[in-house]
Swiss-Prot record:
A DNA-guided ssDNA endonuclease that might play a role in defense against invading mobile genetic elements. Uses short ssDNA sequences as guides (gDNA) to bind complementary target strands, resulting in cleavage of the target DNA (tDNA). The cleavage site is 10 nucleotides (nt) downstream of the target residue base-paired with the 5'-end of the gDNA. Both 5'-P and 5'-OH gDNAs confer activity; a 5'-OH guide cleaves between nt 10-11 and nt 11-12. Guide DNA mismatches in the seed (nt 2-9) can enhance activity, mismatches 1-5 nt after the cleavage site block activity. The gene is ago. It comes from Synechococcus elongatus (strain ATCC 33912 / PCC 7942 / FACHB-805). This is Protein argonaute. Residues 1-94 are annotated as: N-terminal domain. Mn(2+) 3 binds at residue 735. The active site is at residues 516, 550, 584, 709.
Amino acid sequence: MDLLSNLRRSSIVLNRFYVKSLSQSDLTAYEYRCIFKKTPELGDEKRLLASICYKLGAIAVRIGSNIITKEAVRPEKLQGHDWQLVQMGTKQLDCRNDAHRCALETFERKFLERDLSASSQTEVRKAAEGGLIWWVVGAKGIEKSGNGWEVHRGRRIDVSLDAEGNLYLEIDIHHRFYTPWTVHQWLEQYPEIPLSYVRNNYLDERHGFINWQYGRFTQERPQDILLDCLGMSLAEYHLNKGATEEEVQQSYVVYVKPISWRKGKLTAHLSRRLSPSLTMEMLAKVAEDSTVCDREKREIRAVFKSIKQSINQRLQEAQKTASWILTKTYGISSPAIALSCDGYLLPAAKLLAANKQPVSKTADIRNKGCAKIGETSFGYLNLYNNQLQYPLEVHKCLLEIANKNNLQLSLDQRRVLSDYPQDDLDQQMFWQTWSSQGIKTVLVVMPWDSHHDKQKIRIQAIQAGIATQFMVPLPKADKYKALNVTLGLLCKAGWQPIQLESVDHPEVADLIIGFDTGTNRELYYGTSAFAVLADGQSLGWELPAVQRGETFSGQAIWQTVSKLIIKFYQICQRYPQKLLLMRDGLVQEGEFQQTIELLKERKIAVDVISVRKSGAGRMGQEIYENGQLVYRDAAIGSVILQPAERSFIMVTSQPVSKTIGSIRPLRIVHEYGSTDLELLALQTYHLTQLHPASGFRSCRLPWVLHLADRSSKEFQRIGQISVLQNISRDKLIAV
């Protein structure tokens, strides 16, 4: 069955610009094997190898369990106090090999970073999502500024290689949020706006600014804090490091922790020797601060509007930057041209409500009913006041949906503020009592500034086997907000508002599982999984495994997959013919190998794909308006197939406005399996349109990954994985 012949062709423009084809010397590297005196703990080897790369005096890259460089490492650099490198000779790299291509991209990125860093008028930083941030420092780079904040114009720049060895620049507009203030100044002015990350405002030995995770502010003085390991006070230490007497004397002690240390202890620092790492969220909170003047608030709102640049603005600016870099860095005088590719437009998914009635969006279930019914008894807890009435629009919505499904709901179990105990033990008993009465899902109305702890309520309820849907009382819910609250409540009660019409193809996967990991910077919550059938029917979520590194445990993946296969059997009375396993982010070496081998023994086919939220750049289309060539966002469902790299990039969402903002495509890599890329693309795209918890919007990620992602974050917040044993896996507690 030829899918491609039935798809509409489309011409796509990317924010990528051709640089050169790699030469034989570009593809040659020195290879070293690392011998550790003590075997690294599980999950630590890659981090240790990466740290060794910075100590070799040459640009070095990790590849598998080895290290490669473009120039020979000097003999005196081949050994550290607990490791030793052994040269294995030269290695010829091949761009058709994913690991080799990734290593070559890292080399090219490091070379580009070195060259861009040569200018005194700009700075280069590594971007959190990959690539480089190149921005203009000083007054010349400021686009907007206010009291303690600046927005600098810059570019996010990355490199990419295709399987043929062609090197491309990928360039996008980037705005860097920056504060010239110290932590001391920030907390004096905005004490209610929390800090997450801070940085030294002085250079370290490597001429960089060290970043920290922010801990807490104290009233302690630097001269009173003794650094036992150095035999001096905190004040003396900073004076020795170049601090002025004024900086030290006027500072309080703050506590910070290295970002890269999962179990790092808090370290004492000075409030005037640190600056906050300003984020868009912090700037938004400044605009909400009652002490900030109206003019300042207008300036901040203008910032948020100005950074949402259209694809046309982005591609035109990227083209100028690419031409400059080609000339200055690569010695290429020809102008940069955005890369054009042949693409396809995938057909939209067909959504189904009750009795397989077709709907265009999830909101239509209000008139059609839900595809599958769950619990019919609900609790209501009003922690806003002592009124027993449900929020009017939510109540109406629940009754309308129930009517369309020809059933009655039990909504009589209601409690108010005066019923809720203050003592922790009594609160736990409150939830246990409700659970014993058959209530397993509760709508909780409480204001954001309530003295009751939302997270504590959630955990106490989960311990009793109850899922909670929270709602703020003000402003009062209109029918749109009420519908989304109702959908969240129903999903947590095991309902399935909508399903999909299965893709009509013999090779389609009949069980799809999404995997994600979250971290609290000490432990990773991995193997959080969510599964659906080909028609979108939910098989629920699975408990995560707590692990040390971001690499999934192969055994934990198999345990999760096998549980979900058994669920599939219980529903379909057979084993699945094919699985599609989706991994959020990079698939690490060996993660899925055990599962693949065991499925082979059962003659169950499997495909593994990694879904990456970054690295796909921007996708646009050329159109003519008033006789001029302009760019517009590629239509939702647009896909570019890249068979040589076993990958595809696709548009799964749209900006709210055609003239403000631009969408971010997904990049999907086919890590294992024999299914055609176009079928994987179609099934992936249809799963992004399945969003039972939102009436009017689809997901950017496929639904199984969206839920796995939300679940991993929820499990991370809960922290106590054992409490999840009491709650049904059919209840989507993370929506």
